[in-house]
Amino acid sequence: MIKVDKQLRCKRCYSWIEEDWQLPGGQYYCRACIVFGRNQEGKELYYFPSKTSEIEFPVLKWFGELTPYQAEISEKLLRTYQKQKDSLVHAVTGAGKTEMIYNIVAYVLENKGHVAIASPRVDVCRELFLRMKRDFTCSISLLHAEGEPYDGSPLVIATTHQLLKFYQSFDLVIVDEVDAYPFVGNVMLNHAVEQAKTETGRFIYLTATSTLSLEEQVRLGTLEKHHLARRFHGNPLVLPKFFWQGRLQKSLTRGKLPRPLLY
């Protein structure tokens, strides 16, 4: 526990401690993250530094080919990481965001780093695990409420809640579906992601629908934005067209569609 402005705050999940969160002996404890073990007043939290893992070279065994648009984003992610900056990939659903992070993930792993790919949604984590297991040679841990314990793997795929278990462990933290519930606007989960990164580590945020908070970081220059408005097939998005049809009901009654709908 730490005291901020005369109020206790949980050092693990950063939640404010309510007045009635007390044990029979009077000590305060945190109910917000109790599923990970009771953190109470007067007790210390300990962590173990990440160990360097032996990996095969090359760590990436994916033989697919990126489109020119995807390859451009992939290269920008690598350059941005090397410049010690965080990235936002704002790409439409179906653009191939997973494949675009492969090179940067491989780069960090081959330089003896640790990578976490987190999502608020467990179904996304399970899908990512299967794809990464197929395309990478290193050991990979899948962490969620019903998953196995962490085994020291250099590549971790986890729900954002599970990152509460880590402290300054990852050289790269990638958050997929960063706009999704319950992550967006959740102080505890955002704190979990922040504390899981090493002091020199970087973030990559993936989204199809950016948020005002992320766009503000882009405007301030603390986040570098990479935008892709094309799906993997390379065709531009189909944009809706507006037209006024004042006799729609009459046309439908006669069993006919208005002419603009036929083209």
Kindly give the residue locations of the regions a language model identified.
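Conserved catalytic network of the ASCE P-loop NTPase/AAA+ motor domain
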Residues: 107-110, 148-150, 165-168, 195-200, ...
